[in-house]
Design a protein with these regions (language model features):
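Conserved G1/Walker A P-loop phosphate-binding module
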Residues: 1-79, 190-191, 195
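Hydrophobic/anchoring residues in structured secondary elements
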Residues: 50, 107, 169-172
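Canonical P-loop GTPase G-domain recognition
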Residues: 3-16, 142-195
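Conserved nucleotide-binding/hydrolysis micro-motifs of P-loop NTPases
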Residues: 54, 67, 74-77, 112-114, ...
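Conserved C-terminal guanine-recognition region of P-loop GTPase G domains, centered on the G4
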Residues: 90-165
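Charged, alpha-helix-enriched surfaces in structured cytosolic catalytic cores
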Residues: 34, 83-87, 117, 150, ...
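Switch II of P-loop NTPase G domains
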Residues: 18-21, 50-59, 73-103, 111-125
């Protein structure tokens, strides 16, 4: 998949009505500062920030005029108050229940650490809502090559990822894993078109 064109089309806050899109939606979820925006920014899709909790809305990016990348607010941001976190949670839940165009949910997890409580809750929540998330294990460049297999195993086991569950190690610095992510999306949409 080659991204030729991408632009921010819709921004939805807590009280917003979600757009009634007809094109497929590819969703990106993850803890604050895990690298969601960095992954999407491979083609200038989203602004990046070193400040966690920056994405506080659901952002729809129109890609190649035929699909959307949907960026969900980062969860687990320590400086957000409880009321704000609850509002974000309700907004995400409303989106998952409302959208009829979700084709895939990518859940980004920091490969350097065992999945935390919020990661596990988000994974279970996505599964409960009828989706099997694809795990993108970010910050790959922070590991030595000899550590990767062990860390991948820890992430898989920490989430309870099934044997056939997809996990893609990714680095925004070296671009490793980027093509696998885009190829996964391309194959998914191609399978859908052939049905």
């Amino acid at each position: 998949m080659i991204i030729k064109k991408a632009e921010l089309e819709t921004v939805c806050g807590i009280t917003s009505t979600f757009p009634d899109n007809t094109d497929p939606e590819i969703v990106f979820a993850g803890k604050s500062n895990v690298g969601k925006s960095s992954l999407m920014n491979r083609k200038s899709l989203a602004r990046t920030s070193s400040q966690p909790g920056k994405t506080q809305t659901i952002n729809y990016y129109k890609v190649n005029d035929d699909l959307y990348f949907v960026d969900l607010p980062g969860y687990g941001y320590a400086n957000a108050n409880l009321a704000t976190k609850e509002k974000w949670g309700k907004m995400i839940e409303k989106y998952l229940h409302t959208s009829k165009q979700i084709r895939c949910i990518f859940l980004l997890i920091d490969i350097r650490h065992e999945p935390g409580k919020n990661d596990k809750q988000m994974y279970d929540w996505i599964v409960y809502n009828g989706y099997q998330p694809v795990i993108i294990a970010t910050k790959l460049d922070k590991l030595k090559r000899s550590q990767v297999a062990k860390c991948v195993k820890i992430v898989r086991e920490g989430l309870g990822l099934p044997k056939n569950g997809v996990l893609i190690p990714f680095s925004s610095q070296t671009k490793q894993g980027r093509e696998e992510v885009y190829e996964f999306i391309e194959n998914l949409l191609a399978e859908e078109e052939s049905v």
